[in-house]
A protein has these predicted regions:
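N-terminal, Lys/Arg- and Ser/Thr-rich interaction peptides
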Residues: 1-20
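A broad, structure-centric signal for solvent-exposed, well-ordered loop/edge residues
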Residues: 13-15, 36, 112
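Generic preference for well-ordered secondary structure
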Residues: 13, 19-23, 47, 92, ...
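Residues in well-ordered beta-strands of folded domains
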Residues: 7, 62-64, 113
């Protein structure tokens, strides 16, 4: 199977966790639902179209962390727009601005693996990424957090039934057969992320995943992984 590989990075990223309220927290990496939006922005799919174009039954996505995850908190200034207009000064009990603390990933750097059943869409995506072109501006979660990307290649991947290997990407917990081999210095974390949603932005599937926050590979016995011609092993979400 042909897989497009490219790197994406920026100064800051914010992928809002679905279970946070007034003080937004971020996932450590972009979940598949966010990556689909990035892919749609690259080739020009609008917000109503990209969910279908990159649906889970047509598109496979894998995420690799390339640099250590560092999180910081910054204040976001929200303006008061009640009544459908902005008051630049305090009015009654309503301040002109409200500062909300939010969590961000600092200097995020990821590698994205993408495969698509539709050869035309796959080739178009590869052409845009290789020539460093986009139809819409690409960002990392929020429109203000601009992203840059770089083409890494198109590789052949073969599916493997089972084995003890070093996985480069984020791994679903359900793929582990006998746990993992802990290495000194590695930092392992688990998160529950959305992996699929419908046109109404209703999440159809969540997945508990394992990742190593320093960007190191995870040695584990897993089933259903994919091995590339360069020897890299990944798991599609």
């Amino acid at each position: 199977m042909k897989v497009l590989v490219f790197d994406i990075w920026g100064d800051l990223a914010h992928f809002k966790r679905f279970y946070t309220t007034s003080s937004p927290l971020t996932f450590s990496f972009p979940p598949p639902t966010t990556i689909k939006g990035i892919l749609g922005a690259i080739i020009g799919c609008d917000k109503e179209e990209y969910i279908d174009v990159f649906s889970r039954d047509r598109c496979k996505i894998s995420i690799q962390i390339l640099k250590p995850i560092k999180k910081i908190r910054l204040g976001l200034n929200y303006i008061n727009t009640k009544g459908n207009f902005w008051r630049p000064t305090k009015h009654g009990k309503h301040e002109a601005r409200t500062q909300i603390p939010a969590e961000f990933v600092k200097n995020p750097y990821y590698r994205i693996y993408v495969s698509h059943k539709d050869g035309k869409i796959f080739d178009r995506l590869g052409e845009y990424v290789k020539s460093h072109r986009t139809f819409y501006t690409v960002s990392l979660g929020l429109s203000e957090l601009l992203a840059d990307f770089r083409y890494a290649g198109v590789l052949e991947f073969m599916e493997r039934v089972e084995g003890e290997v070093e996985i480069s990407s984020v791994i679903p917990i359900s793929a582990l057969t006998e746990g993992l081999v802990f290495k000194e210095g590695n930092r392992y974390f688990k998160e529950r992320i959305p992996v699929d949603m419908n046109q109404d932005r209703i999440v159809l599937k969540y997945e508990d995943v394992l990742y190593e926050s320093q960007g190191n590979k995870i040695l584990a016995k897993v089933r259903g992984f994919w091995e590339g011609e360069d020897g890299s092993c990944i798991y599609f979400l």
